[in-house]
């Protein structure tokens, strides 16, 4: 259809091109040609009559024409008049503006061509504006701004603004034979224009075609009014809107005239088509029509979505009488084709008004009209939140193809065609007309899904299902054959919609017609939450399906009963069990029920939280960082008595594992301590700390922890020779090795004992938008024993000391049992973490050049000799379902790099800082601190 439209319009272009070679060219610029009649000057009309050439006006700068005929006598004709040939405006990327022009009752207030088949063209403007040319107040008998007996085109412009224009004739802005809008790079805005009483086309009236195509910008028609038909566009030939970036029809209206129809578009001429194809974004919203087609009234309508396509809140009808087609109306003997090719098509909140009553309606198919195809490409959907109506008595014999591809097409139509009542209020759902769709044609579902949701009824003349397709029904929905049979071989029922009373229904309405059901009945959990229903903790029975025929001789065939089986989800979370299908016979009907037997429970990832367990690893990270802080503080210049304060921060990240979620721990706070040196030069430190922690897993849980702790540190240094001599005892003969040991080499011992208490507050964010909270307490204890052997090295500006060391560190952390105080809450048993690690490493120390500070670098290998990973029994409060939850597991070996600095500001103050990084095969830990100590 697109090719025929383009040929029709452009058939005149070769003639125009040949004429343009010899056309008279007139240049326009601001200084010589711009006009503003507010100063009382007289406007001279630009008028030419050369039939052989036509005229081209070429802009040299921005030009504007304002208030011509507005303050006195109206102009005798429009501003630009071409009586002989084509009239062309070449913008050369300049702006052209017309505002408040009054040409009395002359057509073409701005510009016109009057010779047969001559063209009016506007090309390559940075901005083309036509405002109030004329306005209703200025000229109640005024006519359209642009008039062409031939073709009118707006091509290659950056911005177009046509607003507040008025016409007492057809076409609120434009009246032409063929209209073309193409290549708009930024936007084309047509707003608040109107065609007066009984006239058509609030913006454009075309006795030929309307073509809007290939615009990378936004094309919008908003709040335009035709007091006849076609609130924005009216065409007596084809109307084609194709391959644009975004097209918007909002708030347009066709009103007042008795048969006003097509709130946005009207094209009802015999054999003519409205084609909407390949648009990246297309929307019809809030348009209204007095009678038919709140958005579109057409004989033939073909929509192929190139992106999201929306029909929303359009209305047909009024308090004076019933309308037809809230969004789209197809006239008698017409056709409709819908294809969601590269985007979804959605009909929502469109309505038909009849007096004081309104009902939902997407599409109205009048009597002998038909739907040729409704199809959605794989991955796309067509959503009918409003029903389809098909009034009349003469059912079409032409087949409606659902998801059938064209011959030799590479597009696979395996998407979903959805009829749903989910956007209706409870009051609206109670009205049958709001949930009942009828298409009086035989239908074939070729591929993909036909989906019935939330209480809707969908009726075809008859319905046949091809292999590889699926019909998915909610409980409480009905699929009906109005005049013939139902033959289905791929039925699925949405478990999430079953409440123990409602069921999916298949029925025939005509007497003695048959229902055939074969293959499998798939049980689908579309919301993924059905198996969390606590009714499943015990044996349950759900009505599933009712098959009903009319008349005494209708038959219900279930195929070979052995092959009519349930197809359950292969894997799912929640209650585990088995379904069994059973049938009960009644008069002219069969009722199928499914019986549930429970076998177990598998928690979903959002229920299977391991945050309480992993909070113990957070305590593990924090208590080790306190020990590292005290070590860093103590390695500086010793004072006899000192008070110190330091900030501290930790970041820990554990990758996800196949069976356990990843984990992140962030904490920060401060530590305050006091250190004293004994007469024997031993150091004794006591510290208090407060930390604020944030934990998060990779699913839906977050935890906030408030931590308080205390630490005791003892450091003692003894000569290596003295220790060896003591260990040898009072032997009569000292071993030779004793004589090889220097009497000045020290051996350092340190011991640290730390305790942390944490108040945890966890939030779990479920996919149904509920939030469940839980609180508990953790306690952690650490004992750390170590020894080091420092060696002094006299290498100026390189190294001062090398100190190998070894430690043994024991950490115990305990999580209190608790439960979440919600109906869907969980109970967590207590758990504990025990870890014994042996760090082995070496510290390199050097003096700064200023001799007021030191730097040190520590390299450390860590071996976890023993570990008990946290785990606990978890259960649902509302059920006896329980499972074992496991905390994360760190690799047993790691490597750490730690850099520290000490700077003595004066004899009474020192600043110290540290950055540490520990890596294991699947985790990373960063620690930093910065503080000061004061001598007193």
Swiss-Prot record:
Residues 1-23 form the signal peptide. It comes from Chlamydia pneumoniae (Chlamydophila pneumoniae). The gene is pmp7. GO terms for cellular component: cell outer membrane; extracellular region. InterPro entries: Autotransporte_beta (IPR005546), Autotransporte_beta_dom_sf (IPR036709), Polymorphic_membr_middle (IPR011427), POMP_repeat (IPR003368). It is a peripheral membrane protein. It comes from the Bacteria. Residues 636-936 form the Autotransporter domain. Keywords: Cell outer membrane, Cell wall, Membrane, Secreted, Signal, Transmembrane, Transmembrane beta strand. Pfam families: Chlam_PMP (PF02415), ChlamPMP_M (PF07548). The lineage of its organism: Bacteria, Pseudomonadati, Chlamydiota, Chlamydiia, Chlamydiales. SUPFAM superfamilies: Autotransporter. Belongs to the PMP outer membrane protein family. It is found in: Secreted, Cell wall; Cell outer membrane. This is Probable outer membrane protein pmp7.
């Amino acid at each position: 259809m697109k090719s025929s439209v383009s040929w029709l319009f452009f058939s005149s272009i070769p003639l125009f091109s040949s004429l343009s070679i010899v056309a008279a060219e007139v240049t326009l610029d601001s200084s010589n040609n711009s006009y503003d009649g507010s100063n009382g000057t007289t406007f001279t009309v630009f008028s030419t009559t050369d039939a052989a050439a036509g005229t081209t006006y070429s802009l040299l700068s921005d030009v504007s024409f304002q208030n011509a005929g507005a303050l006195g006598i109206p102009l005798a004709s429009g501003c630009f008049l071409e009586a002989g040939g084509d009239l062309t405006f070449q913008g050369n990327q300049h702006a052209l503006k017309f505002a408040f022009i009054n040409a009395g009752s002359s057509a073409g207030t701005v510009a016109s061509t009057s010779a047969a088949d001559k063209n009016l063209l506007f090309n390559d403007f940075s901005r083309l504006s036509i405002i109030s040319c004329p306005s209703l107040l200025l000229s109640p008998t005024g006519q359209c701004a642009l008039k062409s007996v031939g073709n009118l085109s707006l091509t290659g412009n950056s911005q177009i603004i046509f607003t507040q224009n008025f016409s007492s004739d057809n076409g609120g802005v434009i009246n032409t034979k063929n209209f073309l809008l193409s290549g708009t790079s930024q936007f084309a805005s047509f707003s608040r224009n109107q065609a007066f009483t009984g006239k058509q086309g609030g913006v454009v009236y075309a006795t030929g075609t309307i073509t809007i195509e290939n615009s990378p910008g936004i094309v919008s028609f908003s709040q335009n009014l035709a007091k006849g038909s076609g609130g924005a566009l009216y065409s007596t030939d084809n109307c084609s809107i194709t391959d644009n970036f975004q097209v918007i029809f909002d708030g347009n209206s066709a009103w007042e005239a008795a048969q006003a129809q097509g709130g946005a578009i009207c094209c009802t001429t015999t054999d003519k088509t409205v084609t909407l194809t390949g648009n990246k974004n297309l929307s019809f919203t809030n348009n209204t029509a007095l009678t038919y087609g709140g958005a579109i009234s057409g004989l033939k309508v073909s929509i192929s979505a190139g992106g999201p396509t929306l029909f929303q809140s359009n209305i047909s009808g009024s308090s004076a009488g019933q309308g037809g087609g809230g969004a789209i109306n197809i006239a008698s003997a017409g056709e409709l084709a819908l294809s969601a090719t590269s985007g979804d098509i959605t009909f929502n909140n469109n309505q038909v008004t009849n007096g004081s009553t309104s009902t939902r309606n997407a599409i109205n198919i009048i009597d002998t009209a038909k739907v040729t195809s409704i199809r959605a490409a794989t991955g796309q959907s067509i959503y009918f939140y409003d029903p389809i109506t098909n009034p009349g008595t003469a059912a079409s014999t032409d087949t409606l193809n659902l998801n059938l591809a064209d011959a030799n097409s590479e597009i696979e139509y395996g998407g979903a065609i959805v009829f749903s009542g989910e956007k209706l209020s409870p009051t609206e759902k109670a009205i049958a007309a709001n949930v009942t769709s009828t298409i009086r044609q035989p239908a074939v579902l070729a591929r993909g899904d036909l989906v019935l949701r939330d209480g809707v009824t969908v009726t075809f003349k008859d319905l046949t299902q091809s292999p590889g397709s699926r019909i998915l029904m909610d409980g409480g929905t009905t699929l009906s054959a109005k005049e013939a049979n139902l033959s289905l071989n791929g039925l699925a029922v949405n478990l999430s919609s079953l409440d123990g009373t409602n069921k999916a229904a298949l029925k025939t309405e005509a007497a003695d017609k048959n229902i055939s059901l074969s293959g499998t009945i798939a049980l689908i959990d579309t919301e993924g939450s059905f198996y969390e229903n606590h009714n499943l903790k015990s044996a349950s029975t759900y009505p599933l399906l009712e098959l009903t025929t009319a008349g005494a001789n209708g038959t219900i065939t279930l195929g070979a009963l052995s092959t009519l089986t349930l197809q359950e989800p292969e894997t799912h979370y929640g209650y585990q069990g088995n379904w069994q299908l059973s049938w009960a016979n009644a008069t002219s009907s069969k009722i199928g029920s499914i019986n549930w037997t429970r076998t177990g429970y598998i928690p979903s990832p959002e229920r299977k939280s391991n945050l309480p367990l992993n909070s113990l690893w957070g305590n593990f990270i924090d208590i080790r960082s306190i020990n590292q802080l005290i070590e860093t503080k103590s390695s500086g210049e010793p004072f006899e008595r000192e008070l110190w304060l330091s900030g501290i921060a930790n970041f820990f990240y554990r990758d996800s594992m196949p069976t356990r979620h990843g984990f992140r721990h962030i904490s920060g706070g401060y530590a305050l301590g006091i250190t004293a040196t004994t007469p024997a030069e031993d150091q004794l430190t006591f510290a208090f700390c407060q930390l604020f922690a944030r934990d998060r897993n990779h699913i839906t849980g977050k935890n906030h922890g408030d931590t308080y702790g205390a630490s005791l540190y003892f450091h003692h240094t003894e000569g290596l020779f003295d220790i060896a001599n003591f260990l040898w005892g009072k032997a009569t003969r000292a071993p030779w090795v004793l004589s090889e040991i220097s009497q000045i080499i020290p051996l350092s011992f340190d011991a640290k004992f730390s305790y942390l208490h944490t108040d945890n507050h966890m939030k779990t964010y479920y996919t149904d938008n509920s939030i469940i909270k839980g609180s508990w307490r953790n306690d952690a204890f650490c004992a750390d024993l170590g020894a080091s052997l420092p060696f002094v090295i006299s290498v100026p500006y390189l190294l001062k000391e090398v100190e190998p060391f070894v430690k043994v560190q024991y950490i115990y952390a305990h999580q209190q049992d608790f439960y979440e105080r919600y109906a869907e809450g969980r109970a967590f048993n207590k758990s504990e973490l025990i870890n014994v690690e042996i760090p082995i490493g070496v510290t390199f120390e050097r003096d700064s050049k200023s001799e007021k500070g030191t730097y040190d670098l520590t390299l450390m290998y860590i071996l976890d000799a023993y570990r008990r990973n946290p785990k606990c029994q978890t259960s649902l409060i509302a059920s006896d379902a329980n499972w074992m939850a496991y905390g994360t597991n760190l690799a047993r070996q790691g490597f750490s790099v730690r850099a520290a600095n000490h700077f003595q500001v004066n004899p009474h103050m020192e600043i110290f800082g540290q950055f540490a990084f520990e890596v294991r095969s699947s985790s990373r830990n960063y620690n930093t601190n910065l503080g000061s100590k004061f001598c007193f």
